[in-house]
Amino acid sequence: MGYTVADMFNLFQFNEGLNGLEVCRQTGMKPTQMQFAKAENVLTKKTNEQMVRRFGEGWNSIENLRRYQEKKNIILNDFDGERMKELRQREDGTIKDYANALGIGHTRLSSMESGVSTFNSWKEYLKFKEFYKDDLLKESAKKEKDEKVVTKEFITFKNIGGHWEMGKRVKREVV
């Protein structure tokens, strides 16, 4: 799967928690430059240099784009608003109190709890995760660590009837 320039910018913005204008402001890029790059699927040398100067060489590397995509997929597919609601109700908190503490509107928090909307960025998710002291993901999304079984073979020598024979001992360990 290849990434378009629009995908690269959108995934990067999602990961960093920035909108297009904030990226332009921080890099010194004109908003029309970014719009052109997204619309025409062309990343000019100047645009790339401005992004590299501010965000580093790897801002659009394949590894980072895949990581950004994984994070976005976690938010889109595995986020559980009902869990947020349960945690809030367990603490006897109101939506308005939690919204004020998180710095968002109570209607947005309510729509997140009902599953209508999700997080705008990965950084916002991390903020909520820290506030709720829970990962806020569906139970089916949590991967349990697979037990790895390592098989070790040892060569042994046995004295059988006055002469030595070679044998093997197999030992399995859970790591």
Residue ranges and their predicted role:
Residues 13, 24, 52, 88, ...:
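The alpha-helix within a helix-turn-helix
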Residues 86-93, 141, 147-175:
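Interfacial/linker helices and their anchor residues that mediate assembly or domain coupling
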Residues 10, 21, 49, 85, ...:
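Residues within the helices of the helix-turn-helix
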Residues 1-16, 67-90:
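A short, Lys/Arg-rich alpha-helix, primarily the initiator
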Residues 17-36, 92-111:
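Short alpha-helical DNA-recognition segment
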Residues 45-63, 118-139:
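DNA major-groove recognition helix of helix-turn-helix/homeodomain DNA-binding modules
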Residues 61-76, 138-156:
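Short amphipathic recognition helices of helix-turn-helix/homeodomain-type DNA-binding modules
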